[in-house]
Amino acid sequence: MHRSLASGTLRATRPRARQPAALQAAFQSDAKQRNKLKFDSSEAVDENGVPLANTLHENQEFLAHKKNERPIWTALRGKALLNEPSLNKGAGFTMEERETFGLTGLLPHEVHSLDQQCKRAYSQMQERPSPLAKYTFLSSLRDQNIVLFYSLCLRYLDSVLSIIYTPTERTLRVMYRFPARPDLPDVQVGEAIQKYSTIWRRPDGLFLSIAHQNKLREMMMQAKRPKDIDLIVVTDSEGILGIGDQGVGGQLIAQGKANLYTLGGGIDPSRILSVVLDVGTDNPALLNDPLYLGLRRKRVRGKQYDEFVEKFCDIVREDYPQAMLHFEDFGVSNAARLLAKYRPIQSCFNDDMQGTAAVVLAALVSAVKVTKSDLKDQRIVVFGFGTAGYGIADGIRTALMLEAGLTSEEARKVFWCIDRPGLLTSSHTDSLRPGQENFIRDASEVETWERDEEGRIGLLEVVKQAKPTILIGCSTMSGAFNEEVCREMAKHVERPIIFPLSNPTKLAEADPADVNEWTNGMALMATGSPFPPVRNPNGKLHKVAELSDRMITAGVAALARLAPCLQDPDESLLPAMGDVRHISVKVAVAVANAALDEGLSRLGRTDRFTEEEIRSFQWDPVYRPLELVD
């Protein structure tokens, strides 16, 4: 018997004499399946310790329907069991479980269903007066009862998603070197992240400080054993959208992303590790905060930073070879180059660059089908060319090369990219960030274009001169896609494609209702934040597609095929967020089978994946029976 580093639950060798034959079969068939696909750390052995055969589809139907009925074995009893969030059911413990685990006197008499508990918890959350208070409530709920937390979130996804994913809101003045908008109010973003050290109650996730870099492997083992991990979400907290460098508080953005993997993809939350690489902070508010919990020093950069990240990635590659490494909210100076360095040698993914790009590309594929045109014939303006903007452009360029057969130079010429210096051209080579040089226009092309008093070519001038068919916003500059810009674009394009992607809502470049009015209902839109439906010229309300990397595991084509607009041009470019688990299954099947086709799978199989098979591996927030280990 030992205590699991992953969850604190007690595990023990299961007493075979106490297991009925059907239960043994369930454990064994489940172990076979999990051992093959590396989705669980259970030892796939028989009673004699002999490894079980890796039969791929054996008992698949049983697993798909009975996975939530298999018992969990534990030696915890009484308050120790109630204090274990991965096992606690609160009022959901059955009478038999209360008797077995010594809980009868520790709980009120009535046994409540998970549905009843969700309704009560949602009512309690709604009574909280502010987004921060709601976030604190949900965080506390997760610390008490993991199943109830995720069940609540799935049932009320639209209500809680913005709270748990961009946790949560606070007044912030946007500082961006484009024309000021004094008429706009301060925006709200990331209050829980900014107040992390103030509201902190108990540790969650892994904190790797550069001050202890010689103990990285030891510290990682303190969190979870290598075989207990499928996914590692890591951030250095420098580039958190809208609020920038947040030091150790970036742990919350990593945890928020981990929550989305569970809610959207069905990944077992106990098999996800959220990590913050604490290399200091350049945020003066944090450095001067006496309660700040992170490393109190200026952010480490250069060679020392690279060596620290390399040591971490080496440990992940060597000790966690089956785990995917997810880079989250790294700064613009590091995101692209770190991905380029580690992508060829280990399974890694930059959400801000690749995830966002994949969803945008899926929406664009849907949009150009509505316009009855080809992606290669578009003229694309990207407004805001940081990590996300660059990732989107790079993703589209790659698609143009692979699918349309364009050369790299031909694909580059469809873009006009705007950042702090205005339109990026060959005259800006000294001030470009890594990767931006791949998308600059030749300065001679724009010699006659109008410039502002600082010599920059702005958005409106680019729209007038380039006549874009697609306008993508990643600037976090609220209101940048104003009436003049949208009407100018609509002069030259019958169905302008306009994606104000900055989030949260108050940072979006435009309100879809305004864009709809300014383009006479002809714009095809998708946003990075939720907005109310808009009314088309025929008077019909239709939902605006919300582009969110929380929907994507991979598979642009699979996602695009689900677009409602393919049946009705006035409908959304992407399916609703409430369908995210269903969508994730379809996308995962497409990606898994593509990996088989390209010889990239390490599973040694040739038979195709099915939706039922993928669905059987999704973790569901349900109460499984508990069995006591003597």
Where does each model-flagged region fall?
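Beta1/beta-strand and adjacent pyrophosphate-binding region of the FAD-binding site
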Residues: V381
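Conserved alpha-helical scaffold flanking the Walker A/P-loop in AAA+ ATPase domains
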Residues: G455-K464
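Metallocofactor- and cofactor-centric catalytic cores in central/energy metabolism, strongly enriched
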Residues: K36-K376, G391, G395-I396, E403-A404, ...
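Acidic/histidine-rich catalytic neighborhood
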Residues: T387, G422-L423, H428-D430, G435
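Glycine-rich Rossmann-fold phosphate-binding loop(s) that bind the pyrophosphate
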Residues: D236, G384-G386
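N-terminal chloroplast transit peptides
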Residues: M1-L37
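Cysteine protease catalytic core and zymogen-processing segment of caspase-like enzymes
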Residues: A513-V515
